[in-house]
Structures are given as structure tokens and as C-alpha cells.
From Swiss-Prot:
The lineage of its organism: Eukaryota, Fungi, Dikarya, Basidiomycota, Ustilaginomycotina. Binds a dinuclear copper A center per subunit. Its cofactor is Cu cation. It is found in: Mitochondrion inner membrane. Residues 65-80 are mitochondrial matrix. Belongs to the cytochrome c oxidase subunit 2 family. SUPFAM superfamilies: Cupredoxins, Cytochrome c oxidase subunit II-like, transmembrane region. This is Cytochrome c oxidase subunit 2. Keywords: Copper, Electron transport, Magnesium, Membrane, Metal-binding, Mitochondrion, Mitochondrion inner membrane, Respiratory chain, Signal, Translocase, Transmembrane, Transmembrane helix, Transport. It is an enzyme of class 7 (translocase).
Length: 255
């Protein structure tokens, strides 16, 4: 743990959304998008459990009751049943509809950029990220921009995460509609932060955009999710979400 703004005293960054060793499930969602993804996953998983047990029960019943060892005649007459055919045709269709509509709704919401209050331009390089805050101008009349490299393992301090910590974090405010415009400078990369529900391709010559609203303070980690070369696994992403007051103080420090 360490202070984001040492001159301001006890403002300590919170590592509450970092991945855990041997973690299988989702990280805690910190945006409406990730919360929606988690909810959709849980709903579909519920359907899958019922389907698996239902199919297992039918198969077990058929194996036990309709086998040639038990009766050589009974299975010969089980060759047609209009009702059961309707059931196994209509039921999967209803299940697919129950899955499809929430999925489409979430996909359209993820694709919508709703009146962003600020824009962060992100470019993927081999093998680091660069960020530009074009909404803010420093004393030289230039936008705020910086490169973000992974901190080598030998330089890590107490509390910093191996292969995830960077020298310059992307600092953004909470409770603010933020637009990320993402591109690639050389090859295809992928800008992904699981706890924020962000995953967008960084393609050279193309601008892709997505939006996010972060609901709480914290440090949110991600990695390039598109194989981009020999050091693909060494270009992490670290987004630090702070209150608007701390964010403005950070902007002043960058200017």
C-alpha cells in the first residue's frame, strides 16, 4: 500500500479488485457493465444446472427402464411420441429465448457511449500502453500524455503486484462517464480490465471506443488480451479510480 498523493497525507490506494491466487470466478465488479455480466453469467449458469440434471435424469431413466437385458420387447415400441417431440423442441427454444434477450440487452448497453464527461485515448505498443487526456491542457498548451510500462520484479515495493504493477497508472474519477478511445500503434492488442467489464481491441489504423462508469475508488488491473509478440504477458494495465477532488489534484500535478 502506498499514497497516491504523498503531499496530501493519508490518501491510500485500495487494492480491493486485484486478482487472487488460484481465482476461478469473476473479480468484484466495480462498474454497471461488469455487474451486468456477472448477473447474466449467474442466470445462464442456473439454467445450465437444471438442463444438465434434467438430461442426466432422462438418460438414466432410459438406461434403466429401456434396455434389452430388462426386456427384449419394450424398447421396440418406443419409436414415436408426438408429445415428447414437442417438449424437446419447444423447451430448448424457450431456454434460448430466455438467454438471448438479456444477452442482447447487455451487448447493446456495452456498445452505447452515453454522453461522456471525459475521454482517455489509449494506444497499445509492443509492449506497453500510452494514454492521452486530450480534455486537459498543461502550461505548454499540450494535452496530458504518458507511457505506462510494467514495473520489473526487481523494482517492486511492498504491496505491489507482480506482472500487474506499472510505473504510471491511468487515473480517472469515480461516478463519471468516461470514454476510452483505443487503437494500436504496431500490432493488434486488446485493452482489458476484468473488474470494470472492459475488453476492446486495439487495432492499428482503427479507433474503437467504449465507455465505463466506475462506482467506487480502487486500483483495477488488467492485461493485454491479444497475443502481440514475445512480451505479450508483460504489458499490464492499471487504472486508479479516485474521487473527483483527488482527480483534479492529480491533473494539476501533471500540468
Amino acid at each position: 500500500m502506498f499514497n497516491l498523493f504523498p503531499p496530501f497525507g493519508a490518501n491510500t490506494a485500495i487494492f480491493n479488485d486485484a486478482p487472487q491466487p488460484w481465482q476461478v470466478g469473476f473479480q468484484d465488479g466495480a462498474s454497471p457493465t461488469q455487474e451486468g455480466i456477472t448477473e447474466l453469467h449467474d442466470s445462464i449458469f442456473f439454467y445450465l444446472v437444471i438442463i444438465c440434471f434434467g438430461v442426466l435424469w432422462v438418460l438414466s431413466s432410459v438406461i434403466v427402464n429401456f434396455n434389452s437385458n430388462k426386456s427384449q420387447l419394450v424398447y421396440k415400441y418406443a419409436n414415436h411420441g408426438t408429445l415428447i417431440e414437442l417438449i424437446w423442441t419447444i423447451t430448448p427454444a424457450l431456454v434460448l429465448i430466455a438467454i438471448a434477450f438479456p444477452s442482447f440487452k447487455l451487448l447493446y448497453l456495452m456498445d452505447e457511449v452515453i454522453s461522456p464527461s471525459m475521454t482517455v485515448k489509449v494506444a497499445g505498443h509492443q509492449w506497453y500502453w500510452s494514454a492521452e487526456y486530450s480534455d486537459f491542457i498543461n502550461e505548454d498548451g499540450e494535452s496530458i500524455e504518458f507511457d505506462s510500462y510494467m514495473v520489473p520484479e526487481t523494482d517492486l515495493e511492498d504491496g505491489q503486484l507482480r506482472l500487474l504493477e506499472v510505473d504510471n497508472r491511468m487515473v480517472v474519477p469515480i461516478d463519471t462517464h468516461i470514454r476510452f478511445i483505443v487503437t494500436g500503434a504496431d500490432v493488434i492488442h486488446d485493452f482489458a480490465v476484468p473488474s470494470l467489464g472492459l475488453k476492446i481491441d486495439a487495432v492499428p489504423g482503427r479507433l474503437n471506443q467504449t465507455s465505463v462508469l466506475i462506482e467506487r475508488e480502487g486500483v483495477f488491473y488488467g492485461q493485454c488480451s491479444e497475443i502481440c509478440g514475445v512480451y505479450h504477458g508483460f504489458m499490464p494495465i492499471a487504472i486508479e479510480a479516485v474521487t473527483p477532488e483527488k482527480y483534479l489534484a492529480w491533473i494539476d500535478s501533471q500540468a
